[in-house]
Amino acid sequence: MPLTHLNEENQPKMVDIGDKETTERIALASGRISMNKEAYDAIINHGVKKGPVLQTAIIAGIMGAKKTSELIPMCHPIMLNGVDIDILEEKETHSFKLYARVKTQAKTGVEMEALMSVSIGLLTIYDMVKAIDKSMTISGVMLEHKSGGKSGDYNAKK
């Protein structure tokens, strides 16, 4: 399969999506941040001096989805219909799993917006708690599901 982001001279280009059909596009991405018990408890008990960590991560994730095309060179700017973020507490492993669901009606998908949303949300948690635990790890950022468009649906293997 040829790379569509290269022209005949192998130079970068942005793919022309002008002839594509506008359809509903949905993408769901996820990722996890793991930390020590002290940092986890500080977040849960609202004891982080920088403020409400999980609420701030949700707002940052929404902003990340909206700014994706400004940071990913070949990503088209598209109007988003919605961004929903859920953060699950994983007490046993002192982790949080962040899910971002992005929806649009456009000529291109929102996979990158969902992945960016997760990444920025998790990085925000790291930033707000790094004074307590610098050894936090972000892992497993992945596309869980996508629907719409010419390539059809995708579901990650569990």
Swiss-Prot record:
Keywords, ordered alphabetically: Lyase, Molybdenum cofactor biosynthesis
Database matches in NCBIfam families: moaC, PRK09364.1
InterPro entries in the cross-refs: MoaC, MoaC_bact/euk, MoaC_sf, MoCo_biosynth_MoaA/MoaC, Mopterin_CF_biosynth-C_dom
GO MF entry, a single one: cyclic pyranopterin monophosphate synthase activity
The keyword Lyase belongs to this UniProt entry's keyword annotation: yes
Name by which UniProt lists this protein: Cyclic pyranopterin monophosphate synthase
Binding of substrate, residues: M74, C75, H76, M112, E113
Function noted in UniProt: Catalyzes the conversion of (8S)-3',8-cyclo-7,8-dihydroguanosine 5'-triphosphate to cyclic pyranopterin monophosphate (cPMP).
